[in-house]
Structures are given as C-alpha cells and as structure tokens.
Amino acid sequence: MSETIDKTDTTTFHMEGKCPFGGDRIGGALGNRPTLENWYPHRLRVEVLHQNGLAADPLGPDFDYAAEFAKIDFEALKRDIKQFLTSSVDWWPSDYGNYGPQMIRMAWHSAGTYRIADGRGGAGTGLQRFAPISSWWDNGNTDKSRRLLQPIKHKYGNALSWADLMVLTGNCALEIMGLPTYGFAAGRLDAWEADNATYWGPEVVEMGSVSSFDDMVNRDKRWRGKNGDADYDLENPLAASHQALIYVNPEGPYASGDPLASARDIRITFTRMAMNDEETVALIAGGHAFGKSHGMTPAKEIGPPPEMAPMEAMGLGWHNPKGSGAGKDTMTNGIEGSWTPDPTKWDNAYLENLFRFEWEQTRSPAGALQWTPKDPDAPKTPDAHVAGQMHPLMMMTSDIALKVDPDYRKVCEKFLNDFDAFTQAFSKAWYKLTHRDMGPKHRYLGPEAVIEDGLLWQDPLPERDYALVGEAEIAALKQAIAATGLSVSDLAFTAFSAASTYRDSDKRGGANGGRLALAPQKDWAVNRRAAPVVEALRGVMATFNDGRSDGKKISLADLIVLGGCVAVERAARDAGVETPVPFTPGRVDTTQALTDLEMFEWLKPVVDGFRNYVDDGFGQMTRSVSPEEMFLDKANLLTLTAPEWTVLTGGLRALNANHDGSNRGVLTDRVGVLTTDFFRNLTDVDLVWEKADADGMTFALKDRASGQTKFEATRSDLVFGSNAQLRSIADAYAGSDGQRRFVADFVKAWDKVMMLDRFDVKGHRRYGPMAA
C-alpha cells in the first residue's frame, strides 16, 4: 500500500534554502581543533604507527616501482631535464638563464634533512612536498622549483617518483655546469601524506605569535650551554641548528655575524648529518660554486609559506609583493648576491675568492647580514637578470667560517691547491648526501647506480660465494642448535637483538652481516646476554661448514636468526600450538673492516622496550621524553603496526627476552612458553599496579585482596594496559579464544622483523635489480 508524504511537514523535510544544521552557526568539521592533541597533549600517539599506510597510497600494494622505472629511457629522461634546466618561464624566470643552481638547492634541501641519530629525514620519500618541511623558512621557493618540474613529472608519470626526480634534477644541474657526478641511483618511493611523527625540535610557531617566532629563532630550547663552551651541545636527535633551517643560520648563531661561532655550529650540525670535516667543506664550497642567494625584499613583507597560503595559490607560498615578485625582485633567505664571477660554471672561484680577499660585513637590501670584499678591484658578478649590470661578490658568515676555523681552513687549502681533489671530494660527498638514507645497494635502480665501490657509509656486505642450504640442511642445523642446550630465552633474545637494530628510516641495521658479533654491537650493555649464544652458534657453524664438498655453507648471521626460529617453534609447541616459523637463508657475515664504528654506535639504543632495557644514564639525562615514547619510536623504526608492536612485546615477555634475563614484565609462571599470560595478567581486574620507585619507572603487580606482590614490571610493560588503544589490542589476546591467534600473529610479526633488512630477497619488499 503506497503512502502519501506531506512535503509541507517540516518534521520530515527542511524548508527550501534552510541550513540542514540546527541553529545558525557551524563551529567545525572533521579534523578541526581542538582534537586529542589539544585536550591531552601528553597522550601516547600510537596512531603514528599507521601513517603513510596503504590507505593513503593511490598506486596500491601491487604497484612495482622498480619494474616501472626500468621502462624509462633513462638517457631521454636526462635530456628532458637538461633541456628544461637551460630554459626560462615568465612566471618564475631562471637566474642567468639556468635553473641549475636553483634545482641543486632543491635537491640539497630535500636530502639535507637527514640526521644520523635516528636516520629520519633525507630525500628518500620526497617529504619536501609536505608540511612541515615544505613550509620551513629555509625552503623558501623550493615550491617553485618543484612546480617547474611538474611537466616532466607528468610526462613520466608514476614510473618516476618525485623523490627520485628531485635528486636526479640536482645531478643533471651539476653536470650541465661542468661537474662530473659520481653517480645516481633511483629507487626512492614517494610518501603520500605528511610526516606527522618526526620530532623536529621543541619550538612551536603559530602564525601571528611574536613570542613563538622568537622561540624559534633564539635557539635556546634546543641548545645547551654557550657557543664555545665545553658543554655547548645540540639536543638529540636533532641536527639542524634552528627550527625551520636545514643546517645553520647563514648569518651566524643568533644572526651574530661571528664566523668562528658559525664554524662550531656547522661542525656539530654536519656531524649530526653524518658528514666529516672534509665532506662538510666539499659540500659547502661545492654548492656555493653555483648560483646566488636572494634578498631583495624584507622578510616581513613576504607572504605565508605554502601550508598557510590562500587556496587560490594552489600550494605555492611566500608571495613577494615587490615588482614581479620573481627575477630581479626575488626574496628567499634575505642574503643577496653570488659567490663567484661565473655562477653557472664548476670552478674553484669560490675558494679562490674566499682566501684571496679580506671581507667586511654589510647588509643586503632585505637587511640580512653578509660580507663583501674590502678590495674595490675585486672581481664582480653579473646580475642574474639584467644584462650588463654587475655586483660585488658576496660571502655569508657561514662561508667566512671555513676560513677562520683552523681545521676547516686546512681542508680548504688542500682543495684550493688541488682542484681535482676538490672535484672528486664534492662529487662523492654529493652522492653520499643524496643517497645516505637509501640503505643497501640492493635497493638501487638505474644505469648510473654505483654498485661496485665499497663505500663504508653504505654498510657494505661481502658477496656470497657459496651455495645456500636447503630444507634438509636447515632441519639438521635446527637439531644441532637444539643440541647446544641453549635456552629458548637466550636464542630468542639473541635473534631479536640482531634483527631489531634495523631502522626503516635509513634502512640501516638488521641481522644481515652478522654485526652482532662485531664491535661496537658486541660490546653494548644491552647485548651482553648474546655473547655466549654467539660463541655456541659459531661452533655449530664451524662443524657444519668444515669439510663439506657440496659447496653449501651457513653464515653466523643466518644461524642467529635460525636459532630464534628454533626457540619460537619450541615455545609455541609447549603452549600447545604446532607451527613452523619461516626462515629464509642468504644472510652473509661481514667484517670489522667493513663496519664503521662511529656510525654504528648511533644505532645503540638508549631505551629498548622490547628487551626491557633502559640505559643507566637515561635517568640522569635532561629529557622531556618517557621510556614508552622511546619504545613507540623504536616500534616505528621497525615499521610495526600497533597490533604487531603489542603481540611482539607480549611474546618476548613470555619468552623472557629481557636484556638482563630479569623477570620484570615476565608476567607468567611458564617462562619460555608462548602463552598469553602477559596480556591476561596485565588486564586482570583482580590485580592492581603500584609504583615500586619514586620516579615511577618500575611497578609491582599485587593481588587486590591479599596485597601480595605477584610480578614486577616497567613502563614499557604497563603501557599496554594503560593506553586505551594498546589495551584494546591486549584484550583481543587475553580472552579465552586468544591463544592460537596470538601465536599466529606473533610468528608473523617475528618473521617480519627478521626479514626487514633482506633487500636481497626478490619479491619480499620493493627492491632493486640486485635482488636475487
């Protein structure tokens, strides 16, 4: 039976033209403040583990970038880029008729965010396209550089990532101006959303807030001590001297114009970015051989950065109201001028000018502090846009720093007297700068990738010269490992210790290479428990490898991981679940000579919640971060999701993979058995937690009724019960039906960690052509 609806009834239909919302105000929509971060600023942001997931990627999980890139005519691509570099468009004309210097800056600033402390930053995912990096003051007008490249990006489509295009364009720019580049490797996969997790410093800048802007530029929050004092140091894990700068303030600390103070900042900053003194000088002197700095308009007159620009700007920021806003009116960092008489030619004029002349301070049209030669007869540099117009040479305070610092000066003098050495040093330092975060050479794509050279910063691994073991040999090796009498706990601890050094930020660490047996890792306090296990496994390796005639061998690196498989299988079996743990052989053992001690020392954990480790000095550190936040950071570096993080921790506690073998967090009476006891006891409503120390670092789990202490634990344990998101996952395993799911999920997460560094395995992750 049909029903007639009275359309005049306003309880059913809104009147025409009336807002569907009640009332006459709309206060907000999804994502508008205030949000959780405003209400509860100290909450653990577990959701950051899920950023840049497949849901954000329009290309989907089956897109094979390596295969698509291989279809590109690489030489044709480079010709397209080089043809563009020597062109010019009216809306953003090229300096000197050459976009090369501008593109070098774009590529440099894309790569220059890299820092060795946690491996984050760098050019690897093209994050210069997103906030906050896109809108840092030091990245002024890089938005124009990327927009100029848009036609080339569209021509090659998804076969060429933005991350690769930016670096390759920088390489092409160097080549057309005369520098023989060391090489170029593609293989960078674009991010599809902003990085909302990386810690870039304590400063917060709100538009229109003078006090917060002062917080940014005065540096006091990230630096300790005074420049020149013995305790002068930069907060970890930071590398940049200022918020929103790539390296240092070119006018000197606090825009002081002090070259020696600038040199101190340069050394700290470039060291934090994994560069030594020679590489630092090569990069600064090499980069400043090209182009010019722009400072024709006071900064206060420049519009907001891309992230704050009006919608019609379409992602372009820093609107300049002076003249055309571009060309001869361009404003970028406020300093105006060029370092050399021929800014589009690779030569030694930068160093020649720096040392030949005495320099005096002056001001740019924008008011920035800079330096000009005292000698009125010093060479001039041509205007970038007005034919026949000449200008004095320019140096920044950070350039004069290379002359006044004794150690930097020695390097400068070496390069000044040997242009070939300078050329090679800059070429190799540029390659390192732009490839530092790419990881092993197995990820490298393209005909110009440097594969043969054993560059120490690439953490090289020797080529395998033996046949891999098969199923029969693996079974025999498992029996041999079991026969050693090594416990489930010791085997699991050792395997996880080796594999969990991996960090996806710069693709370093992991079990491949067997570096757990080498300095510095073998000497870390957190790894002390692994030493006897490694020695026992060496014996298994020697017995297996010696005297074989079939060419098959096993590496120590593989045996360490296989030992973990033995432990997990046994622990699951004892819990009533029979399950195989995947094992993929092929890891090799590297040598001490191929291990950079200083660079690997940065992988040493201060806090490792997986192994319930907190460095002895952590409590004495000046810090604003908790152990559980450091634990979350570690989970992110291991690419773990919140469920993977949770199930791994629960399983490792059941196995007792604590660094010292203590029972903290081992919430079970069946140690070494892969049970869900950790989750059941953690969430048991009949038990209550109490602080066991004044700092709230350790806790006692007591029976509510009797007050008897049952277990002890740390913040890295309690977080899985105190954080709502993690507790919801813990509940999924604590239930009566959780055991089999727990074992299955633990095995998957375990294998994921063991395989994170296996870029040599074809099809395992997105790899380059060396994968076999």
From Swiss-Prot:
Any one of the GO CC terms: cytosol
Catalytic reactions of this protein: H2O2 + AH2 = A + 2 H2O; 2 H2O2 = O2 + 2 H2O
Top-level taxon of the source organism: Bacteria
Residues annotated to bind heme b: H288
Sequence position, cross-link Tryptophyl-tyrosyl-methioninium (Tyr-Met) (with W-108): Y247-M273
Record keywords, A-Z: Heme, Hydrogen peroxide, Iron, Metal-binding, Oxidoreductase, Peroxidase
GO molecular-function term, one example from the UniProt record: metal ion binding
Annotated site, Transition state stabilizer, chain positions: R105
Active site: H109
Positions bearing the Tryptophyl-tyrosyl-methioninium (Trp-Tyr) (with M-273) cross-link: W108-Y247
Cofactor: heme b
EC number, UniProt record: 1.11.1.21
Cofactor note: Binds 1 heme b (iron(II)-protoporphyrin IX) group per dimer.
Modification note: Formation of the three residue Trp-Tyr-Met cross-link is important for the catalase, but not the peroxidase activity of the enzyme.
GO terms under biological process: cellular response to hydrogen peroxide; hydrogen peroxide catabolic process
Family membership noted in the UniProt record: Belongs to the peroxidase family. Peroxidase/catalase subfamily.
Function: Bifunctional enzyme with both catalase and broad-spectrum peroxidase activity.
Subunit-level organization: Homodimer or homotetramer.
Protein name (database record): Catalase-peroxidase
